[in-house]
Every structure is written in C-alpha cells, then in structure tokens.
Amino acid sequence: MRSFPQLSLLRLFLLLGLLGTSWAGVGGSISGTIKDPSGAAIAQSAVSLVNTGTGARQSATTDGRGTYTFPVLPIADYVLEVNHPGFKPYRRTGIALDANSALRVDAVLQVGERTDAITVSDNAAHVETSSSQMGEVIAGSMMTGVPLNGRSYTDLLALQSGVAPATSITSSTVQDVGASAFSPSGDLNAGNISINGQREFANSFMVNGSDVEEDVNMGTAIIPNLDSIAEFRILTNNFDAEYGEYSGGQINVITKSGSNAFHGDVFEFLRNTNLDARNYFSPSRGSFDQNQFGGTLGGPATRNKIFFYSDYQGTRQTQGVDTGLIPVPSIQDRSGNLADLASSLVTTVSGPAWATALSQNLGYQISVGEPYYFPGCTNTNYSATSTTACVLPTLQIPNSAWSAPAQHLLQYIPAPNQPGNVFSTSAYNQTLNDNKGAARLDASTPWGLISTYYFLDNFTQNNPYPTAQGGANVPGFNAVNLGRAQLLNLGSTKTPSATAVNEFRFSYLRDSNDLGRPQGGVGVNLASQGFQVGPNTPGIVPLSPQTEGLENVVFNNYSIGTDTNELRQSNNTFQWLDNFSKVVGTHTIKAGGEFHYDQVNTHAIAQFNGSFLFFGSQTGSDFVDFLLGAPTQYNQSQLQPFYGRNKYLGLYAQDSWRL
C-alpha cells in the first residue's frame, strides 16, 4: 500500500539478527527438590534440562535444601537429568512447559552405581505447578483441530471462564473523531473482551511477550497465522508483578520455533456457495467464495545452534452482500407524480423565504402556513380564512420545479425491483485480499539464547455498502479499507551464573489503516451535479478535492453518494523491557522494568465534501423534500487531525518464596 509511509523493517531485522541482538521468547520456569529414598535433601546434585527440540542444555546445582530452579525457560518439551555420586542417574522425559507457567518437578534418587539408571516418562503431561497465576493454556494442536471461521485465535478467547464478549465496539465502525475499531487482517475479531468484569480496553495483548495492542480501542493489531502458534495463554487473576500495567487479562501468544528436525505443512481451506441458502427476502442467492492457503516451514540452519521458522497465509474472499428490503420511490414518484405519497403530505409551508422559493418554482402564489395537500384542495391564493388552497393540488411536481441537484442525483436512487416499491439485491460483492507471514530465528550463542521475530500483514477490503463510514446502502458507491501491520521484536536471554538470568527485549509495532477510502462515485465534481460551488458563494466548498464525487444524500430508508467518514490512522509502539531473575536459597527474586513510547497519528476526514439529510421535515415526505430542494440538515466539517503521544515507565520487584 503506497499510501502509508513505512520503515524497511526487513532490512533492520536482518541487520540486528547478524549483530546478535535477540530474545528467547516468553516461557516459564521449572523448579523442584532432589531427595534420597528416606526423604533427606541431596545437596550439590548436578541437574540438567535438555530442550528436546533444539538440544539446548541448561545446568544447575541443588542447594543445601536439595532445591534447584531454572527461572527462565522457553516453552518446549524438556528432559530432566539428575546426577550425584553414589546414586543412580535419574532421567525424566516428557516435561511440557507452557507460557507463563511455573512447574515443580521433584525427583527421588535411588542408591546405586552410575551404570544403572532410572527413567521416568511423563507422557508430555503437566506436572505440579508452583505458580499462583490463574489462566488457561490453549495449545496449537487444539486450535488447528477445530473449525474456526477466519482461522483466528481470538475466536477462542471465550473458552476461558470469566470472559465475556464486548458489545460496544463494532469492527470497521468509526466510533468518534480519531477512534475506530479496526479489524486485523481485514475482518478478524480484534479480541475486545471483558475479563472478570473489567472493561474491554483493560487487557494486554502480546505476541512472544511484545505489546501488540492497537492504541485506540486496545484490541490486538497482530493475529499470527494459526498454524504458526505454539500456544496462547490468558492470565485472568493473580498476575506476577511484571504484568502490572493492565487490570484486565494478560493474553500472550507464543509462536513456534525451529528445531533439529525439519517440519512444516501446506494447507488450503475452501468455502463456497454450494451449501448456502438464499435469504428469504432476496431475489437470488448471494455468492460466497473463500480460499485460505499457505504453509509453514521450520528446521535447523545449523544443527543444535541456529533454528528458523517461517509461515505464510493468504486469504481471498468474495462475498455477495445482501441489501435487505429497502423502500424506494415508485416509478410514479420518480416522474413527479405523488399520488401514492398523498397521505404523507400533512405539513404546511414554514418560513417566508421558503414560501417565496416555492412560488417562483411552481409559478403561482404560495403563502406561509399553506397546506401541501388535502383532498379537494386547489391552487387558489391561500389566506387565513381559505379552506381550499394547497401547494400541490394535482399531486404533480413539474420537472421545472425540481431542484437542480435532484434532477442530476435521481438517477442514482435505485428503482424498485420487488413488489411494494422495494429494492433488494445481493449481486454486489465484498472482496478481501489478505497476505500475512512471519519469520523467526533462534540461536544458542556465547552471548546467550537469541531470537528475532518479524511479522507482516497487508490487506485490502472492498465494501460495496460502506454504511459504517456514513456511505450508501445502495449499489454504486463502494469504498475500500486498507491495512498494514508490522511487528519486529528482538532480545537476548543471558545466564551470567547458574542462579541468575537476565532477559532483554525490544519491539516495534506499526499498525496503519485507511478506513472508508471512497471509490464508487469519485471523480464527479459537485458543480456538474447542480450545486453551487466555491468560496464566497452560498454553495459548497469541497474540502477534499481528491475525493470529490457524488454528493452524500441521506433519506429515511436509504442513502446515496460517497461515504462521509474516511479515517486514516497509523500507530507506532516502541517497547524496551528488561527482567533479571536471581535464585537465593528458597527465594526467587525477579526485578525489572518496561518503557514504551506510543504514537497515534489520526486524520479523520469526516463529511469532507458535505452531506444532505432529507427526513421529510418540510413536506412530510423525504422524497418530496428532495425534489423540491428542502433538506432537513446539511453537515460539513474540516480535516480533524489528532496526534497522540504517550510515554510509559514501569518498575517492579517480586520475591517468590517457596516454603
């Protein structure tokens, strides 16, 4: 999308990757106690954890109470190995570590020779946890095993108890000046939910520990390819101190990483119209075709050292949008014959200026207070004692009396195609073209565990009826939504000693959207539509000449013209975070801080070329008001920019004491 300024994140990603700045990903911790058969603690035991996917090994030594702790670990399956002179080697397999989990794995060593060994298999099941945090883990295999419309993890957030969907925000709807609920990937759920009664903007959304919130309505701006997600977790209560910025839930998505084995998949999901039913009120069945395709690939770049993982998903969607049943003017009405609208003409002429204008247009004297119509009325001069005079005695408005804009714009109001002067169609399609992909690089180096992650999502959505942006609900005035989301996170996890770990992370999120860019009806200047135009005139001054088009006109049941509320918004979030963990006896002390700088750049182009509203306030009929040129209201506003800047600094310290 050329309309958005962009940073060449890919080049920055490659450069920093070569420099070795990285991050190992958000994971959990494993601790436990080593004892002999009598229950006595065994000090100075050599404890090792081996990542079964990458072969990475970490080591620790038990203290005087026989305890060990690995305070910071990436999510993975692990093997625990314990050795001590005079005891048989102990080996425990299938230890599955999830995001933000704290597992307790104890071991009892048996007296014997080192040539003997004890192996215990956990079959990848969770073992006893030593964390007070409350939340649910949803594994990647669970997500890909259920049919999800749109293939988004946010559709599974309600599986957690205490979660309720929000109803105050509608995707792609302008909520206020400079505020809109954007849909990630064009039409996915941004995850605005209420957790344990908190407001929907009180939640934290993270991908690999990096902040990925859209900075206005606080939903997620990033939804990774479902096949690339290892798991996600919702923390709902008793968060650790490092999550103190938000009072709602903590939603953390962890993406897959490469391993010593090559693994990947290719997929294609097809949905079409074949089994769809026709809307009862529509003359035909709307089309629907959706293809979601892509794949993943991960493996070793250098065995036991450097690992990669990449993914791509494309979505192509064509969907016929049903207008529903829209009451429109009859063929008779469109000729100026108002016989079937007679019962609506129940008001009287208001104001001397309007009475003068009607007199000039109709060619006979009209007075203030004169009824527009009643059965048996005539066009005789009206007076306070008159009982027969009315404005439209023949219920016919000659073309010469129509307003100039009405003569030009009538052709854009659809004629009825259903009984009862109703228009309905599902022949016009909404289309979506979305491409998103990511690449992750992990490495075990002398500088620590290293990882880089880059995500890019581009989408274009064409909407035939952009009513959410003040556009028409009849054909001919489509608008497009354009979006791009990018995430780069870098970090390093270093182990300066057997009892200390330091994590550093930097991330950059850019989320850009152009919502409601007019397409249909653009390029028709206002002067050619019969309007007076230009400065120093009683007419319209176009404030956005590049989108000048057919004037927006709103009636009681339908509207025509280009949409009135285009919103261009780009958000930037820069985040720096550092955590330091130290094991001291039975205490695990963790301290750190986070700083992020948020930018919100918004251009709300609301009613840039004006909007006329006809609600029948003059004659009693919106269509008759339109023909005569008597709008209820006219709105126009200037460009409304908003540039928000926010700096956040948070520090914390926490001591987890194991009794």
How would you describe each model-predicted region?
Residues 54-55, 82-92, 391, 401-404, ...:
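A short, solvent-exposed loop/turn motif at the edges and junctions
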Residues 63, 87-257, 263, 270-282, ...:
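Periplasmic N-terminal accessory/gating domains of Gram-negative outer-membrane beta-barrel systems
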Residues 233-234, 265-269, 311-313, 453-455, ...:
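Transmembrane beta-strands of outer-membrane beta-barrel proteins
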Residues 2-4, 10-139, 211, 225-227, ...:
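Periplasm-facing N-terminal accessory domains of Gram-negative outer-membrane beta-barrel systems
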Residues 81, 108, 196, 235, ...:
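Transmembrane beta-barrel domains of outer membrane proteins
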Residues 315, 327-398, 585:
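Glycine-rich (often Gly-Gly/Gly-Pro-rich) flexible segments and glycine-rich loop motifs
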Residues 116, 153, 191, 203, ...:
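Outer-envelope beta-barrel architecture signal
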